Design a protein with these regions (language model features):
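A conserved acidic beta->alpha catalytic loop
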Residues: 23, 38-47, 63, 93
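Conserved donor NDP-sugar-binding/catalytic core segment of glycosyltransferases
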Residues: 93-127
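Glycine-rich, basic loop-to-helix element that forms the pyrophosphate-binding segment
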Residues: 60-78
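Short beta-strand/loop segment that forms part of the nucleotide-sugar
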Residues: 31-40, 59-61
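Short aromatic/hydrophobic "clamp" motif used to bind/position activated sugar donors
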Residues: 83
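Short, acidic, metal-binding catalytic loop of nucleotide-sugar glycosyltransferases
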Residues: 22-31
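Short, flexible, basic/aromatic active-site loop/helix in glycosyltransferases
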Residues: 132-155
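Cell-envelope/extracellular polymer assembly enzymes that use nucleotide-activated donors
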Residues: 3-5, 33
Length: 155
């Protein structure tokens, strides 16, 4: 049984998909399967994946039903201990996947983890930060929206 199954959903942008898959395959832990779900890209994305990354399982969809539908199509077949959903513009740093898996193994009460997102120049992407859900956080968010300060709810 796989320890990790990685799912990357694509719609075009073969350049980004190639960089994503290259970074994943450089860092891939043992017992990992990589799936690419192509959402009926209008370009040669699926063909590029098939030609350049034969070790990846390619799923070709006949329509673009969105990110969630494409992920769910593969998630129903996942038999691994863990699943990782990646956007195609993601690049994985060496050692990150092993670090995430070790963290999950050491914390069996945790059901999901996320990573810090940084821009191409290494700056933390504050727009991707989310707070822990709570009544206070929700109240603060909506109060800030009333005064037009939604950006500060992510800092």
């Amino acid at each position: 049984m796989d320890r990790l199954q990685i799912i990357v959903v694509t719609y075009g942008r073969p350049d980004l998909v190639a960089r994503c898959l290259s970074s994943v395959l450089r860092s891939i832990p043992e017992k990992t399967t990589v799936h690419v779900v192509d959402n009926n890209s209008p370009d040669d994305t699926a063909e590029m994946v098939a030609a350049r990354f034969p070790e990846v399982t390619l799923h070709r969809r006949t329509s673009n039903d969105g990110f969630a539908v494409a992920n769910n199509a593969v998630l129903t077949e996942v038999t691994a201990e863990y699943a990782l959903l990646l956007n195609p513009d993601t690049e994985i740093e060496p050692g990150l996947l092993d670090h995430l898996l070790d963290g999950m193994d050491e914390n069996p009460d945790v059901g999901m983890v996320g990573c810090r997102l940084v821009t191409a120049d290494g700056i933390l992407d504050h727009a991707a930060k989310r707070r822990i859900p709570s009544p206070w956080a929700a109240l603060r968010y909506f109060a800030l929206r009333l005064v037009g300060r939604t950006g500060s709810s992510y800092t």
